[in-house]
Amino acid sequence: MKKSIAALLLLFSSVAVLAQQFNPLLVQNDRENQRVWVGSIYSNMSLQEKVGQLFMVDIYSSDPKEKKDKVKDLIQNQYIGGIIFSKGGPKQQVQLNNEFQALSRTPLIMAMDAEWGLAMRLDSTFAYPWNMTLGAISDNKIIQKIGKRIGEHTKRIGMHINFAPVVDININPANP
């Protein structure tokens, strides 16, 4: 009986150790493997593909099919490097994000301008206070928590970059 229990413990501990292995490309501190991976992709690109990687195109997740098809064509034939999402809905955006990534030979950089959260661009999402309001708060810990939550929300829908915060000059009283 003791041998059976010992064998089971050994089996379960082996499975637990193997389950903790990970992809080195997904580990933030494994820069060398990441550099090698990027280098291997880049060295196999044509000049046209390298130039295409410099461009990001804007699309609304609520755009008509024709516009989405044009972006798909740019991904497949001009090898664009990324997408900047604008207005639309979260469900449609995640679907488009997945469709676009599946079409691209190289992972696309997905971006959005969401200064005060996803609600700045997407319907039915949580809105945070605008930057002018945040600037009036004296407790930096609150500001940090809000920024962290906005980052978590944008990451959850597949964004790599949030073009925020920005420095705006407030000269238009109709747009504070």
Residue ranges and their predicted role:
Residues 20-176:
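N-terminal beta-rich core of secreted/periplasmic extracellular enzymes
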Residues 1-23:
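Bacterial Sec-dependent N-terminal signal peptides
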